[in-house]
């Protein structure tokens, strides 16, 4: 599943091709994605793309009329192609520009989304409820500490809660907790303030490094130019069950927390 770094890498990849260009046509081949694609997305036709933004794992293609909102879901990909490029299986949506460039949305599992937000309308509820962005000053370890004081849930589940902070998905939660030396099973309220202050900084570093490396390619994710992400080469615990810990050489363990595979070193994480 594409997580925040992968979505940010996609944004960085498509932005230079879209910003300043006019949308000629939006082609919807399959309306039934996670939610039905609204007919109102066609209101963007004829308008210039002013910006391409990201909020959590949502991408906003801004025009004077409103914003096309894209979510990659479990397996979504965005490709920049010539508008004459033949479609392949699972190519559901084309955003065709007047210069012949096309942003093509492919989603094999159809858990992605294409929504519309008209200029002046309030934010869609699920977006308005999101917590702060992890790479901004609105998020830090103090926030984690303050919000965790009554939380009995495992700390890994806590930092993956989008109301606490957006974008700390399963891969990066595992990696951040390993670097911080925190057992992912530990109750959130039992983690010390000192540990949370360090964890806040580590989350920022891990996500920034993943973006710099082009995201993590495990199965479905590729960059907008079709190239893979390389952060998978730097994973220290995720997906390494049974292998030796890079620090102490103990065996990496795996359990399920919140229906997610969780990887950790019992010796290094307390």
UniProtKB/Swiss-Prot annotation:
Where, by residue number, does DNA bind? 90, 109, 151
The protein's job, in short, is:
Involved in base excision repair of DNA damaged by oxidation or by mutagenic agents. Acts as a DNA glycosylase that recognizes and removes damaged bases. Has a preference for oxidized purines, such as 7,8-dihydro-8-oxoguanine (8-oxoG). Has AP (apurinic/apyrimidinic) lyase activity and introduces nicks in the DNA strand. Cleaves the DNA backbone by beta-delta elimination to generate a single-strand break at the site of the removed base with both 3'- and 5'-phosphates.
List, alphabetically, the NCBIfam families matched.
fpg (TIGR00577), PRK01103.1 (NF002211)
SS bond list? none
The cofactor required is: Zn(2+)
Q: Does the keyword Repeat apply?
A: no
Catalysed conversion reaction = Hydrolysis of DNA containing ring-opened 7-methylguanine residues, releasing 2,6-diamino-4-hydroxy-5-(N-methyl)formamidopyrimidine; 2'-deoxyribonucleotide-(2'-deoxyribose 5'-phosphate)-2'-deoxyribonucleotide-DNA = a 3'-end 2'-deoxyribonucleotide-(2,3-dehydro-2,3-deoxyribose 5'-phosphate)-DNA + a 5'-end 5'-phospho-2'-deoxyribonucleoside-DNA + H(+)
User: How and how many cofactors are bound, per the record note?
Assistant: Binds 1 zinc ion per subunit.
Q: Where are the FPG-type Zn fingers located?
A: 236-270
- What Pfam family is a match, any one? Fapy_DNA_glyco
Name the keywords, alphabetized.
DNA damage, DNA repair, DNA-binding, Glycosidase, Hydrolase, Lyase, Metal-binding, Multifunctional enzyme, Zinc, Zinc-finger
Q: InterPro entries, alphabetically?
A: DNA_glyclase/AP_lyase_DNA-bd, Formamido-pyr_DNA_Glyclase, FPG_cat, MutM-like_N-ter, Ribosomal_uS13-like_H2TH, Znf_DNA_glyclase/AP_lyase, Znf_FPG/IleRS
The answer to keyword Transcription applying to this record is no
**Subunit text:** Monomer.
- Name the catalytic site residues: 2 (schiff-base intermediate with dna), 3 (proton donor), 57 (proton donor), 260 (proton donor)
The organism's taxonomy opens as:
Bacteria, Pseudomonadati, Pseudomonadota, Gammaproteobacteria, Alteromonadales
Q: Give the organism the record lists.
A: Pseudoalteromonas atlantica (strain T6c / ATCC BAA-1087)
**GO biological process annotations for this chain's record?**
base-excision repair
EC number(s) recorded for this UniProt protein: 3.2.2.23, 4.2.99.18
**GO MF, one annotated term:** damaged DNA binding
| Record-stated family | Belongs to the FPG family.
Name it: Formamidopyrimidine-DNA glycosylase
